[in-house]
């Protein structure tokens, strides 16, 4: 939840008393024109920047830096290390989220098959198309099974077929997360 968030940049107020409460298991979208403050709010929630005033909560308690390990974030500005091999980089990113190497490889292989990119495991990132790289980044965002997912412009650069694939996976993840939280 975000309560009464205000954020100013120089002479521009990007967020003016914004409050939002998203129930567990829910899927929300932030809609608005360019410059409306969507990315600013996301950057505040993910603690990339701070609000000028207001409060943030995660599961009913004040949000703290260690909560970021329980959140998956796919930023609008995508970036992978171009010279690394795809699989090597995906394992590295999984390890940063606390997944051991063998478990990371197993989970990644499952996701790579689901997204039909298993043939790219040993290729360098620079050989990937923009859409393929975005699939890898989506996978590394959700791999550690975060309790909350935040996507900024998740469908940007995808063709219609892959937009549908990504939508399906986001909905499936939302359903799975709500089932776990309900204790089912």
Regions found by a protein language model. Name each.
Residues 163-178:
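Helical segment within the ABC ATPase nucleotide-binding domain
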Residues 54-69:
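Conserved ABC transporter NBD signature motif
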Residues 91, 95, 103-120, 171:
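Conserved ABC ATPase "signature" region
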Residues 143-147:
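A short, proline-enriched helix->beta-strand linker immediately N-terminal to the Walker B motif
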Residues 46:
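Helix-to-loop junction immediately C-terminal to a conserved catalytic motif
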Residues 124-131:
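Conserved ABC ATPase signature
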Residues 149-153, 158:
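Catalytic Walker B motif of ABC-type/P-loop ATPase nucleotide-binding domains
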């Amino acid at each position: 939840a975000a309560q009464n968030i205000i954020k100013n940049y120089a002479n521009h107020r990007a967020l003016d008393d914004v409050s939002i409460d998203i129930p567990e298991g829910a899927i929300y979208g932030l809609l608005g024109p360019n410059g409306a403050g969507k990315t600013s709010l996301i950057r505040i929630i993910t603690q990339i920047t701070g609000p000028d005033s207001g409060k943030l909560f995660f599961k009913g308690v004040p949000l703290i830096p260690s909560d970021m390990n329980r959140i998956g974030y796919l930023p609008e500005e995508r970036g992978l290390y171009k010279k690394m091999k795809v699989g090597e980089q995906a394992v590295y990113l999984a390890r940063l989220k606390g997944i051991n190497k063998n478990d990371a490889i197993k989970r990644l292989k499952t996701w790579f098959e689901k997204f039909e990119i298993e043939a790219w495991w040993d290729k360098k990132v620079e050989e990937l198309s923009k859409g393929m790289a975005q699939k890898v980044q989506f996978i590394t965002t959700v791999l550690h099974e975060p309790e909350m997912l935040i996507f900024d412009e998740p469908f940007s650069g995808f063709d219609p077929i892959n937009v549908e694939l990504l939508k399906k996976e986001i909905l499936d993840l939302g359903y799975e997360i709500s089932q776990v939280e309900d204790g089912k």
